Amino acid sequence: MAMTDTEFHQLADDMFQAIETAIETAIDEQDADVDIDASGNVLQLEFVDGSKIVINKQEPLHEIWVATRFGGYHFGYVEGKWLDGRNGGEFMPFVQDSILRQSGIELSL
């Protein structure tokens, strides 16, 4: 059965909240310098060097798109997991690794 828009937004919002919570913990524990801007369908992370990671919800496709300085990625929800459409990698480990590579900040997601 296809996912409804309401289900998509609930899953995506839960994931956005988990990322925000992990970053706030890193700010507290590691004195990490990250600006978090959550606005509508977009979660933007800006690091001390000015680089950004932008995560946004693509409602018509029921996908999460991520832009890092290393490239753009599309994640779809498959069997209870957000998976990269190209290589099948899971979303949360990908975000964790991208933040580490881009900023040196270690998150617990």
UniProtKB/Swiss-Prot annotation:
Gene3D superfamilies, alphabetized: Frataxin/CyaY
Pfam families: Frataxin_Cyay (PF01491)
Keyword Metal-binding set for record: yes
Transmembrane segments: none
Gene Ontology CC annotations of this record: cytosol
Domain of life: Bacteria
Keyword set, alphabetical order: Iron, Metal-binding
GO BP annotations listed: iron-sulfur cluster assembly
GO MF term set: ferric iron binding; ferrous iron binding
Matching PROSITE patterns: FRATAXIN_1, FRATAXIN_2
Record carries keyword Metal-binding: yes
UniProt cross-references to SUPFAM superfamilies, sorted A to Z: Frataxin/Nqo15-like (SSF55387)
Cited function: Involved in iron-sulfur (Fe-S) cluster assembly. May act as a regulator of Fe-S biogenesis.
NCBIfam families attached to this UniProt entry: FeS_CyaY
Family in the record: Belongs to the frataxin family.
Protein name: Iron-sulfur cluster assembly protein CyaY
Organism: Shewanella oneidensis (strain ATCC 700550 / JCM 31522 / CIP 106686 / LMG 19005 / NCIMB 14063 / MR-1)
